[in-house]
Amino acid sequence: MRRALDSAAQAGLCVLLVGIALIAATPLRLPALGPETAVAPPGTRAMWLWEQDEPRPVVEWAAANGVRALFAYYDPQAGPAELRRLATLKGLCDDAGITLDALGGDPSWTTAHATALTWAASAAATGLFHGLHVDVEPYLLPSWPNDKAALVPPYLALLQEMSDATELPVEADVPFWLPTVTLAGGQNLADAVLARVAGVTVMSYRNTATGANSIVGVADDLLRRAGAAAKPARLGAETQALGDCSYCSFHGTSEERLHTTLSAVDAAAQRYPAFAGIAVHQYESWVALSS
């Protein structure tokens, strides 16, 4: 989920988020939970940071709210002032025990691999980042509904190329419905993505903890598949407004409601070996819940 979607993209995303809720009612053949990965303790959080916010308040907020990983937007065209800001952010994160990952991505990267690889190389060359956090979302391309079969192979190739391009681990944002897509030959798209990245953040954007159409409920299949692949999977929680999808975000609720719900997610997700905590999207709208 990029910083703020334009109205057309937001409308398209809402259709995906709302329509795919019907998937929860469809029986699926799921992989076993698997014992291969370590479960994050309750309260483990991550956070997206898309804007060029002042570093100290960001890190103070993050540390106070259990954030152990920060995904900070990186522009490969960043000038000296922005690089100094990121260096300050890195130093403060190090002091607070928070890992700093470079955040970037665009649906166009699905086929514009040179742009994506230039970004990855530039981010790695700064020496500021622990990993690369990529948010590509090819399903937001206008051609996705009709050309999905043509777009999936370059998307998977991109993830592999990025993973091979640097020594930094690559973590990908993925929609919770990814396992519903089957590739030519019968492979599941979620399994194919997990095979190419170090970990995933599931955009499980719901504002209830458990049940058929909840954060844990919609992410169950991906959590199981991540466990079988021995890859960590964070669950995502949205605090920005998402069009007409009132149950997809905590926007308009409260910090207390968010905290209570995410604590319940922590408890319910302990049964999944792949569970790596909860990532909150994003800093500014999360802070706004407390005002």
Model region roles, listed by residue range:
Residues 50, 99-112, 155-185, 230-241, ...:
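Aromatic-lined carbohydrate-recognition surfaces of secreted/lumenal glycan-active proteins
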Residues 49-64, 111-125, 181-193, 215, ...:
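Short, acidic/polar
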Residues 231-291:
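Substrate-binding cleft of secreted/luminal carbohydrate-active enzymes
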Residues 27-76, 172-176, 278-286:
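Boundary/entry segment of secreted carbohydrate-active catalytic domains
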Residues 71-76, 119-152, 276-280:
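Active-site groove signature of glycoside hydrolases
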Residues 72-105, 146-172:
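Aromatic-lined substrate-binding rim segments of carbohydrate-active enzymes
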Residues 72, 130, 136-140, 186-215:
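Aromatic- and acid-rich polysaccharide-binding/catalytic face
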Residues 1-17:
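N-terminal Sec-pathway targeting helices
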